[in-house]
Regions:
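N-terminal phosphate/diphosphate-binding loop that engages ATP/GTP or pyrophosphate donors
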Residues: 1-53
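Phosphate-binding/switch loop-helix module in NTP-utilizing enzymes
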Residues: 34-99
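A short acidic, helix-capping loop that chelates divalent metal ions and anchors anionic groups
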Residues: 66-67, 178-181
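Conserved catalytic-core segment of NTP-binding enzymes
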Residues: 73-179
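C-terminal boundary of histidine-terminating zinc-finger modules
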Residues: 183-192
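C-terminal alpha-helix
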Residues: 197-212
Length: 221
């Protein structure tokens, strides 16, 4: 669980999809009728693990088998939880999705205020970023931005600008970050150029989120 160790969480939470009895109780059994909108408002407090900086982590897991996804009790449970988190939670919610576009095809990320694409310095990564922008628009995600990973901004930066994808910043390749990962330490403990860049990206991200918040409030008037 790389994300857990990055957050300084030594014992990551068990994936929610592994709680078969809970899913059956809330959403129904496999192969039969199931509840499309099960009760999920207590899941964060009961199954989330809090990191040293106050971040609460939940691991969803996956229930998709072949094709574009299944509609089953486990899937209904996870979708209901995501809707609850994005519509009812007062805190910021960050979804760390698998690399690629599969979650966009399943509509898992529908309703997000901002999609952040991590772009590697290569042609395939840029092609994926272009597809993500298109698919995000199709499911109603109005705002996307990119973070360039491992340096090599030059042509990557220019191509992202051509695509109309704002850039939050660039994380340079940093041996200190790699060493921290090998030692299962949170990146922030490593210091160095990469961490300094991440701090700047965080500041720009907060500014972007605030602008989106104001835009959303204005649209409701």
């Amino acid at each position: 669980m790389n994300l857990a160790s990055s957050l300084g969480i030594e014992n990551p939470p068990k994936p929610l999809v592994d709680f078969k009895d809970l899913i059956q109780e809330r959403a129904g059994a496999e192969g039969g009728a199931f509840i499309y909108n099960p009760k999920v408002d207590d899941i964060v407090d009961k199954y989330g693990v809090i990191g040293p900086d106050g971040v609460r982590m939940l691991v969803m897991g996956t229930v998709d088998k072949g094709g574009s996804g299944c509609m089953c009790p486990g899937s209904a449970f996870l979708r209901a939880l995501l809707r609850h988190l994005m519509l009812n939670e007062k805190s910021a919610v960050i979804l760390d999705m698998e690399a690629g576009i599969e979650h966009l095809g399943r509509g898992t990320t529908r309703g997000m205020d901002l999609m952040i694409i991590v772009v590697e310095p290569g042609a395939r990564s840029l092609e994926t970023a272009e597809r993500i922008k298109k698919l995000s628009s199709e499911i109603g995600i109005k705002h996307i931005a990119a973070v360039i990973n491992k340096g090599g901004a030059g042509k990557v930066n220019a191509r992202l600008e051509e695509l109309g994808i704002p850039i939050l910043g660039e994380i340079p390749f940093d041996q200190q970050l790699m060493q921290a990962d090998l030692e299962k330490r949170a990146p922030i403990e490593a210091g160095g150029e990469a961490v300094n860049a991440i701090v700047k990206i965080k500041e720009k991200l907060m500014e972007t989120v605030e602008e989106i918040r104001k835009e959303n409030e204005a649209s409701k008037k």
